[in-house]
UniProtKB/Swiss-Prot annotation:
BP term (GO), one: behavioral response to ethanol
UniProt record similarity statement: Belongs to the short-chain dehydrogenases/reductases (SDR) family.
Catalytic activity, as annotated: a primary alcohol + NAD(+) = an aldehyde + NADH + H(+); a secondary alcohol + NAD(+) = a ketone + NADH + H(+)
Known partners and oligomeric status: Homodimer.
Entry protein name: Alcohol dehydrogenase
Active site: Y153 (proton acceptor)
Phylogenetic lineage: Eukaryota, Metazoa, Ecdysozoa, Arthropoda, Hexapoda
Keywords: NAD, Oxidoreductase
GO molecular function per UniProt: alcohol dehydrogenase (NAD+) activity; aldehyde dehydrogenase (NAD+) activity; protein homodimerization activity
PROSITE patterns, A to Z: ADH_SHORT
EC number, as in UniProt: 1.1.1.1
Residues annotated for substrate binding in this entry: S140
Length: 256
């Protein structure tokens, strides 16, 4: 179902990162009512730039680390909902790429995403009288086929795809729809230098960047297109400047 971002309220976790900041710039061009950015480190210059792009959009920043206990996330969301009354879209975009940091990679890329999603369901779940909402989770093409030198990172992204696909199937119960956007290799600081698992490939970043990549701007443009297409359960691939819906193969069914 096509979705217009005009006059909508959007929460963007990690909306000041490489792909995140360029996506935030595209979002404010769509005449949002509010863009609420949750990120670990404040960037006043970036916030000012977003406000300058479209002064009609209210851009707000709150410090947020996705690895905090879920109770802290719920407290922050309560503050945001009290201010805005309604939130239309949650974008979960926090991510790190460093297979030296096993626990933190899992905590940021997967557990934090699950906890933030779980927390917002308290406000959105129609079983609790909520209005429903839209969740856009940022995965990666490595969630389809791993970069085998970074199996921890790739594994977290596969988990994001699976979790989000389950959320989408639960929409008739919760009223909350969900989909993933899965960027290919994008030229950001995330991929300029990173560590492989157990140092199996010390030059993994250099070798990866020797192959075709995309700019964060082209990725961001397709990111927002995916949000506007608003297809529950979609698994979007954003690679080399293109946007493509992935058809997932079913090899097993729980039967329930």
């Amino acid at each position: 179902m096509a979705f217009t971002l005009t006059n909508k309220n959007v929460i963007f976790v990690a909306g000041l990162g490489g792909i995140g900041l360029d996506t935030s710039k595209e979002l404010v061009k769509r005449d949002l009512k509010n863009l609420v950015i949750l990120d670990r480190i404040e960037n006043p210059a970036a916030i000012a730039e977003l406000k300058a792009i479209n002064p009609k959009v209210t851009v707000t920043f709150y410090p947020y680390d996705v690895t905090v206990p879920i109770a802290e996330t719920s407290k922050l969301l309560k503050t945001i909902f009290a201010k805005l009354t309604t939130v239309d879209v949650l974008i979960n975009g926090a991510g790190i790429l460093d297979d030296y940091q096993i626990e933190r990679t899992i905590a940021v890329n997967y557990t934090g995403l699950v906890n933030t999603t779980t927390a917002i369901l308290d406000f959105w779940d129609k079983r609790k009288g909520g209005p429903g909402g839209i969740i856009c989770n940022i995965g990666s093409v490595t969630g389809f086929n791993a970069i085998y030198q970074v199996p921890v990172y790739s594994g977290t992204k596969a988990a994001v795809v699976n979790f989000t696909s389950s959320l989408a199937k639960l929409a008739p119960i919760t009223g909350v729809t969900a989909y993933t956007v899965n960027p290919g290799i994008t030229r950001t600081t995330l991929v300029h230098k990173f560590n492989s698992w157990l140092d199996v490939e010390p030059q993994v970043a250099e070798k990866l960047l020797a192959h075709p990549t995309q700019t964060s701007l082209s990725c961001a443009e397709n990111f927002v297109k995916a949000i506007e297409l608003n297809e529950n359960g979609a698994i979007w691939k954003l690679d080399l400047g293109t946007l493509e819906a992935i058809q997932w193969s079913k090899h097993w069914d729980s039967g329930i």
